[in-house]
Amino acid sequence: FGISLGFGEKSVKEVCEAENVDCDTFLAVANFISSEQTSFSVEELPKLSIPSLMDYLKNAHTYFLDFVLPMLRRKLIEAIGCSREDNVAFLILKFFDVFVNEVREHMQYENEQVFSYVKALLGGKLNRKFNITMFASHHSKIDERLKELKGIITKYYTESSDNLLLSATL
């Protein structure tokens, strides 16, 4: 949501108001993430601000692409090394890089296509060439690739000098 740290003794509502963030949406997302839910409750849905939710998702994409994935790559290299002499480690890193590219394309697709579609819907315009099920098919492919990467590492990479770091990276 772009809320800065160091908000002191302010309540959630006060912080959200100061940061111009919809409080109900913030709380719904925070509860969603902290309880590992797979969907919002029926009671939460009418309270959600779709524009605030889209802003959150755009910020999450930026955080993931610019911070999380590069950090994971560094940790992966640190855990498995990455010399061309170690073919398995080199292939794992190449697979990771392909995965990152797919994630980047997926998030760009969401930012450009899905969010534009939702924004148009909010404005009362329906694009009959696009529907949300098209978007859903993109998500399952990314999840499958991540599981595949984890499977490859746990099944084929046996030479880790730092198993704790590799486990933490996974």
Label each residue range with its predicted role:
Residues 1-170:
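Small-residue-biased structural context
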